[in-house]
Design a protein with these regions (language model features):
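Conserved beta-loop-beta/alpha segment of the NTase-like Rossmann-fold superfamily
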Residues: 188-262
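ATP-binding glycine-rich loop module of kinase domains
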Residues: 353-388, 410-411, 418-420
Length: 647
């Protein structure tokens, strides 16, 4: 059988094995609670105390109830029809092995007044409800194209951090609204072993919307003990769902949070919502709801007055007990907090919403982590990217799963060329590309594709950059590194778009830079990742010169180092922009300073002037897609380079 969790008034059981010969459980009993006083007609069991201290009642052969204090390492046998009970002095974990008569229980006295036998409601899987419907407005431009639950932290989506803490037996209910299809597609690929229920929330903005409304939308799926958590909440651990509790974190600004006061036993005694007279610990958006019927009743009574989920806790005395759990909390819901902690090692942050994740695979039989897989999510539909797999399949990873916005493949062994930073290997890859890619083909409408991709796209991207008024603190400056370059429009007017060299090919990558090339030393092979969808709207054709220009740009800027915001920046003084670039890759710097690639280009009869123009256009096109300060660096580096091409 698959392991399951069974809820109990005093804690819970984890059923690890049940067959026609035996049942194996772990039993968790909360301090201060007790099991039923009960007996069995057929079931025989042995209990071993793994941890904790308990008072064990056990009927002897003379029908006398003996009471013994037992600790970790002690055990006791129960034969039918001996009466017995366990009272937890501390939190107790028992290991029970029994005959398979799991429903054979006669309750003589039970604090929850349960009847004999199996209690069906205890056997419904508990759940966690992840509230991921909102726009994530506090994250500003980072969530313009993607749900905040999918933002990566340490190369893993925030929502995956939550799911990985959730016991395997729990159902997962996800409240969705903004960018719902992206979240669904990601979760199905990243966590195929989990049981998801997706709830579409019909109101995600304006009066009455919010976590409370989203949670109520999931109500029919939460008629059982459950956690709820906001999709921007990361914690180090998820305490057991054996009692009601709220996750809290110390704060000095109670007017911004719902805050709680509690006694020495962590019992909540008072609740305050966003008041300067509040308390020292803030509710973090994570709660365990054991008494779910009371919770829904209290939420219904109070939510109309405040519209907030915390209104269910205003009358804390309505619950049998309600505790706090002091947790190590990371709030990823604001742009400053998120940027501070994201620490993604395998991708350069973009404002497009495209995200890369590294997910541990799990063995379906043993549940242990095995190898890793790469998942990429794209807000824009990727049918062309998928179509291009047929052209590039000899050179790219084997794609294992894909849909309209997501694709996945096993993590490629090796490292990127930037990470290796070996002069000979850079050169070797350039020769490999020349020998394996860029085979010329005939394309009748290539002039149209060329114009769409270079001129029209550049005009759109420049407009997009100029409209980023919130991010750009200055108007365009026309002097770069003490050279007067003129306006960007003046520079673009210099380009004769029809005269740019071009060679149509099927075998192009489209983002051919060294952070997208994996080298495996064991098989001495290159693998290309993150290939482009199309060229000017066509997935079938590309331009050899575009790949060459991408490579040229990757010699000039180490994109891997741009993950650190301090490595590329601009400084403005007296009407001049100075470009600042830090590069810690001596191999790349050696090739750049020796102009090796310039010489290679000319020795292979390619037009170096065209490649430099296209590289400057590439930098300009990249600028609106990245965050500050790299955004501004790319724009002004492109301006300077384009100026140098025509001076």
């Amino acid at each position: 059988m698959k392991s399951k969790r069974v809820e109990k008034p005093w804690g819970h059981e984890e059923w690890l094995a049940l067959n026609d010969k035996y049942c194996y459980k772990r039993i968790y009993i909360n301090a201060g609670t007790r099991t039923s006083f009960q007996y069995h007609n057929f079931k025989q069991e042995t209990n071993y105390i793994i941890s904790g201290t308990a008072e064990v009642w056990l009927e002897n052969d003379n029908n006398v109830i003996e009471k013994s204090i037992m600790n970790a390492g002690d055990y006791f046998d129960v034969s039918p029809p001996k009466k017995h009970r366990v009272i937890a002095i501390t939190d107790v974990i028992l290991q029970e092995v029994s005959t398979p008569h799991v429903d054979d229980v006669i309750r003589l006295q039970d604090d929850a007044e349960r009847t004999d036998g199996r209690i069906e409601s205890e056997h419904i899987n508990p759940a966690i409800c992840i509230l991921a419907a909102g726009f994530g407005k506090r994250l500003e431009n980072l969530t313009e194209n993607i749900n905040k639950a999918l933002l990566p932290v340490e190369d893993k989506a925030i929502i995956s951090h939550i799911i990985d803490l959730t016991p395997a037996s729990f159902d997962i209910v996800v409240a969705l609204g903004y960018s719902a299809n992206l979240v669904k597609g990601y979760l199905k690929i990243a966590h195929p072993d989990r049981n998801f229920t997706f709830v579409d929330v019909d109101k995600i903005d304006g009066h009455g919307s919010g976590p409370g409304y989203s949670l109520r939308s999931c109500r029919e799926h939460l008629q059982r003990p459950f956690y709820f958590i906001t999709a921007d909440c990361i914690v180090d651990n998820l305490p057991s769902l054996d009692t009601n509790w709220l996750g809290v974190f110390r704060t000095g600004i109670p007017e911004l949070y719902s805050t709680v006061d509690f006694d020495e036993q962590n019992n909540i005694v008072q609740f305050s919502n966003k008041s300067s007279d509040g308390f020292e610990h803030a509710f973090i958006g994570l709660a365990a709801i054991k008494e779910y019927k009371i919770f829904w009743s209290e939420l219904d009574k109070n939510i109309k007055s405040s519209g907030e989920v915390v209104s269910a806790f205003y009358n804390i005395k309505a619950y049998k007990d309600f505790k706090v759990q002091k947790l190590n909390w990371t709030d990823t819901g604001t742009i400053d907090n998120y940027i501070k902690i994201r620490n993604n090692k395998h991708s350069l942050a973009k404002t497009t919403g495209e995200c890369l994740y590294r997910i541990k695979n799990k063995c379906p039989s043993c549940g242990q982590n095995t190898d890793s897989k790469c998942i990429k999510v794209f807000p824009k539909e990727i049918s062309n990217k998928i179509k291009r797999i047929d052209y590039l399949k000899s050179f790219i990873p084997h794609v294992t799963t894909k849909d309209n916005h997501t694709l996945s493949y096993n993590w490629i062994a090796g490292d990127t060329l930037y990470a290796i930073d070996n002069v000979s290997l850079y050169k070797k890859f350039v020769e490999w590309s020349y020998n394996n890619l860029w085979k010329p083909v005939e394309c009748k409408n290539f002039n149209e594709l060329h114009d769409n991709f270079y001129r029209k796209k550049t005009e759109q991207r420049i407009k997009q950059y100029m409209e980023c008024k919130i991010l750009r603190k200055h108007v365009e400056i026309n002097s770069v590194n003490n050279k007067y370059c003129g306006s960007i429009q003046d520079l673009l007017d210099n380009i004769d778009w029809n005269m740019l060299s071009r060679i149509p090919t099927n075998l192009f990558h489209g983002d051919l830079q060294f952070d997208n090339i994996i080298y495996n030393n064991d098989n001495d092979g290159f693998t290309m990742i993150d290939w482009r969808d199309d060229f000017g709207g066509s997935p079938d054709f590309g331009d050899v010169y575009y790949d060459l220009a991408k490579l040229y740009g990757s010699f000039l800027i180490n994109y891997r180092e741009m993950r650190n915001n301090n490595n590329a920046s601009i400084s403005i003084w007296d009407g001049n922009v100075s470009l600042n670039l830090i590069d810690h890759s001596p191999g790349l710097v050696e090739l750049r300073d020796s102009h090796w690639f310039d010489k290679w280009i000319e020795s292979h009869n390619f037009d170096l002037h065209t490649i430099k123009i296209l590289t400057s256009i590439i930098f300009l096109n990249m600028s609106p897609l990245h965050e500050l300060p790299f955004k501004d660096y790319l724009f002004y580096r492109g301006k300077e380079m384009l100026h140098d091409c025509y001076r």
